[in-house]
C-alpha cells in the first residue's frame, strides 16, 4: 500500500491527493491548503456520526435476526411482526405532510418523463455511450432487435435484408402516425416534407397536401425550408427527428427521402460509483473520479479497436436547429448526468480521520462529486462551450441504501456542509433518495 501523508488532521493517500491538487483544484477557485483543511474538518465532524448510525443499523439487525430465530417454527403473523418492528424503532411513525419548492431543477428532472440508464462510472466507454444515449436511431434499434420478428423472410443475416428494412420503415411510420399524426392521411404515404409559413407542409402520394393535426408538434428544422435535411417534432416533451436524405442508403428508396428517424431517448443517466462498480483501492477510485472529471469538463474520450479499425468515442455536442419562428433552437445532445455515490456502510483507506479510522467512502464521494461538478457549473456561466451537464446550475447525487429518516437527515446535513465548504449556494446539491 502506498505510504500516506498528513494534511492537517487526516491521513491522505498521496496519489489521491496529487490527483486533486494537480487535476481538479486548478480548475476551481479553491486554494489547496484551505481545501484540505476544510475537508479534514468535515471528515472529523461527520465520520463519528456515520459510525453511530451504522451502530444503530447493527442493533436493529441483531434484534430482527433474533426475532426470526425465535419464531422460525411459527407462521409469520404480519400484525405482530409489524408491531415488533415498530417497538424496536425499525418502523418509525409517519411524519406530518409537507410541501417543498425546489429551485434550479433541470427540465429532465422537473418536467420530462423519459428513460434513465445506469452505468459503471469506472468504464469510460460505457459512460460515454450512456451519456450519448440521449438520442438514438429508431431504425438501428428496430433492425437489430426482435421488436421486428425474425421470421424466415425477415432475418437480419450477415448483410442488409431489404424486407426486414421495410418492416422497420413501416414501424417508424406507424410511430409517427401515433405520436405526431397528420390532419389527413398517413405518414406512410408522404412523398415530401417542407416548411411553409411556420408549419409543416406535407405532400401525399396522391399529390394532396396536408399538415400536422397539431401545429405545436413542429418545433424546428435544419436545411432549407423547401428541402429540409431534418424536421424536428415534439410529443409529450420528447423530440422526434426525421432525417431526410434522398441520396442516403435508406432515403434513396424511401418515398419521402426519409433516411432515419432519431428519437430522444435516455434523458437522464446515473453514473454509478456503487453497485455496478468494482473500485477496491485508491487507484480504482481515482479512475472513477477522473472519468467524472472528464464528463463534467466535456473532455472524456476513449479509443478502442473494432473490425480492424480504431473507433473513437467522445461526448456529443448539443444539437442546433432553426426554430420555426426564426433564430436557433438548441436541444441537449447528452443525458443529464447524476452521480450515484456509495452508501453509508462502505469505508475507504484513501483517508483516515483524527482517530486513525478509515473514512466513510460516501463522504469522500460527496465532496469529490460536488468539487468536480463545480467545474461544470462555472463553465455554464463562463465559456459557452455547449458541453454543460446541468443547465439549471445543480448537482444531482443519488444516495443509495439509506435506512430511515435519520440517515436521510444526516446526508442532508452533510450536503449542507459540503456546499458551505466549497462555496456553493445552498441546495445546489440535489439528493436522490434510495
Short names for language-model regions:
Residues 2-75, 79-92:
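N-terminal-proximal low-complexity accessory segments that begin disordered
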Amino acid at each position: 500500500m502506498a505510504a500516506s501523508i498528513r494534511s492537517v488532521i487526516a491521513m491522505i493517500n498521496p496519489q489521491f491527493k496529487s490527483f486533486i491538487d494537480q487535476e481538479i483544484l486548478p480548475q476551481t477557485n479553491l486554494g489547496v491548503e484551505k481545501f484540505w483543511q476544510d475537508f479534514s474538518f468535515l471528515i472529523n465532524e461527520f465520520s463519528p456520526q456515520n459510525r453511530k448510525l451504522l451502530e444503530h443499523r447493527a442493533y436493529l439487525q441483531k434484534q430482527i435476526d433474533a426475532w426470526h430465530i425465535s419464531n422460525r417454527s411459527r407462521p409469520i403473523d404480519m400484525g405482530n411482526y409489524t408491531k415488533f418492528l415498530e417497538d424496536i424503532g425499525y418502523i418509525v411513525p409517519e411524519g406530518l405532510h409537507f410541501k417543498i419548492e425546489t429551485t434550479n431543477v433541470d427540465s429532465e428532472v422537473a418536467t420530462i418523463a423519459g428513460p434513465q440508464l445506469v452505468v459503471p462510472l469506472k468504464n469510460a466507454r460505457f459512460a460515454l455511450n450512456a451519456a450519448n444515449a440521449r438520442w438514438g436511431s429508431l431504425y438501428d434499434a428496430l433492425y437489430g432487435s426482435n421488436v421486428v420478428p425474425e421470421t424466415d423472410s425477415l432475418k437480419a443475416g450477415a448483410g442488409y435484408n431489404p424486407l426486414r428494412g421495410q418492416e422497420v420503415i413501416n414501424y417508424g411510420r406507424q410511430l409517427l402516425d401515433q405520436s405526431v399524426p397528420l390532419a389527413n392521411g398517413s405518414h406512410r404515404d408522404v412523398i415530401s416534407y417542407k416548411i411553409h409559413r411556420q408549419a409543416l407542409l406535407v405532400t401525399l402520394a396522391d399529390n394532396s397536401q396536408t399538415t400536422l393535426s397539431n401545429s405545436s408538434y413542429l418545433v424546428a428544422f435544419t436545411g432549407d425550408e423547401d428541402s429540409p435535411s431534418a424536421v424536428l417534432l415534439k410529443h409529450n416533451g420528447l423530440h422526434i427527428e426525421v432525417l431526410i436524405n434522398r441520396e442516403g442508403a435508406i432515403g434513396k428508396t424511401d418515398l419521402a427521402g426519409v433516411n432515419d428517424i432519431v428519437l430522444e431517448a435516455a434523458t437522464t443517466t446515473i453514473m454509478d460509483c456503487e453497485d455496478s462498480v468494482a473500485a477496491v483501492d485508491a487507484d480504482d477510485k481515482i479512475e472513477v473520479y477522473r472519468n467524472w472529471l472528464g464528463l463534467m469538463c466535456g473532455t472524456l474520450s476513449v479509443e478502442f479497436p473494432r473490425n480492424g479499425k480504431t473507433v473513437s468515442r467522445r461526448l456529443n455536442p448539443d444539437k442546433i436547429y432553426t426554430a420555426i419562428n426564426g433564430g436557433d433552437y438548441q436541444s441537449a445532445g447528452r443525458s443529464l448526468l447524476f452521480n450515484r455515490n456509495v452508501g453509508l456502510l462502505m469505508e475507504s483507506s484513501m483517508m483516515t480521520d483524527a482517530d486513525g479510522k478509515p473514512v466513510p467512502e460516501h463522504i469522500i464521494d460527496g465532496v469529490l462529486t460536488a468539487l468536480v461538478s463545480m467545474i461544470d457549473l462555472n463553465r455554464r456561466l463562463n465559456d459557452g462551450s455547449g458541453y454543460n451537464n446541468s443547465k439549471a446550475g445543480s448537482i444531482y447525487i443519488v444516495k443509495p441504501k439509506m435506512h430511515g429518516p435519520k440517515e436521510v437527515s444526516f446526508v442532508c446535513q452533510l450536503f449542507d456542509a459540503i456546499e458551505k465548504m466549497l462555496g456553493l449556494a445552498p441546495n445546489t446539491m440535489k439528493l436522490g433518495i434510495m
